[in-house]
A protein has these predicted regions:
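Alpha-helical residues within the helix-turn-helix
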Residues: 55, 72-73
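Key DNA-contact positions within bacterial/archaeal DNA-binding proteins
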Residues: 62, 118
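Mid-protein regulatory/catalytic core that forms ligand/cofactor-binding pockets
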Residues: 128-234
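Short acidic, hydrophobic short linear motifs in intrinsically disordered regions
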Residues: 44-52
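A short, conserved structural fragment
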Residues: 73-80
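Basic, amphipathic "hinge/linker" alpha-helix immediately C-terminal to the N-terminal HTH DNA-binding motif
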Residues: 83-102
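Short, hydrophobic-biased segments on the C-terminal half of alpha helices
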Residues: 68-69
């Protein structure tokens, strides 16, 4: 009996998946999550502290302290008096590799398996720690070398550092007018919120004003009045039309 094209894709996916990881650096899923956490905190705010990491990772402060000691010893991090923890070149490369895997998997889940954009993050979180570089290279080729993930994030090429294309957040917008949503943070609750309000990548929005009293960003989206909190506005990246 012949397999359908969908079944063939799934068979190939899991056949390569079981080959496991091929890495020179001794990494664990937990350590990889810490690296991503430090990178993500660094893109949103100033000093990266043990307290911020513990809150973001939802772990105890002693657990963070222990992991930071290991990562400093392995030269994945350095500690700066003003900035807190900073990723070294090695740490940045490992983070870029993780985002490359994660985002390629997300594209695969949407394009080949029919997932919606708010469903893919958790699946990709699991798979990114398991797949080999051989798998990732094959996946990238099969997907015709996509440049962005379903959330608008840049997919770095092999051995290249992650450089996001869009950096202006909705929270930083001051001039009323029309904007395009270009990228959003890969956060489950945020993605569920955006899905609920039908806010999508490359969608045009009309920024009306920031209301100081309610502390909400007032938007018009296809004739719908939408109010966005500062926390959400900080995670939506836009481009002025």
């Amino acid at each position: 009996m012949e397999l359908s094209s969908s079944n063939c894709i799934l068979s190939a996916f899991f056949a390569i998946l079981v080959l496991g990881k091929q890495r020179g650096q001794k990494m664990t899923p937990n350590k990889e999550d810490y690296l991503k956490c430090i990178y993500e905190i660094g893109t949103r705010q100033g000093k990266i502290t043990n307290k911020e990491i513990a809150q973001h990772m939802q772990v105890s402060p002693p657990a963070v302290t222990e992991m930071m000691k290991k990562m400093l010893a392995e030269e994945l991090l350095i500690k700066d008096k003003k900035a807190g923890y900073l990723l070294t070149d090695l740490g940045l490369q490992l983070v870029s590799d993780l985002y490359r895997k994660h985002r390629l998997i997300e594209v695969f889940l949407v394009q080949k398996l029919g997932y919606t954009t708010d469903e893919i993050h958790q699946e990709a979180e699991i798979l990114e720690h398991t797949v080999s570089e051989r798998f990732v290279a094959g996946l990238e080729k099969m997907l015709d070398f996509p440049e962005t993930c379903p959330h608008g994030g840049t997919i770095p090429a092999k051995h290249q550092l992650l450089k996001e294309k869009y950096h202006q957040t909705l929270a930083s917008v001051q001039e009323p007018g029309n904007y395009l949503i270009r990228r959003v943070h890969d956060d489950f609750e945020l993605l569920a919120y955006l899905e609920k309000h039908n806010l999508n990548i490359d969608q045009e929005i009309n920024f009306l004003q920031y209301d100081n009293y309610s502390q909400l960003y007032q938007l018009d989206v296809d004739g719908r009045a939408i109010q966005v909190s500062p926390m959400i506005a900080q995670q939506i990246y836009v481009e002025k039309l």
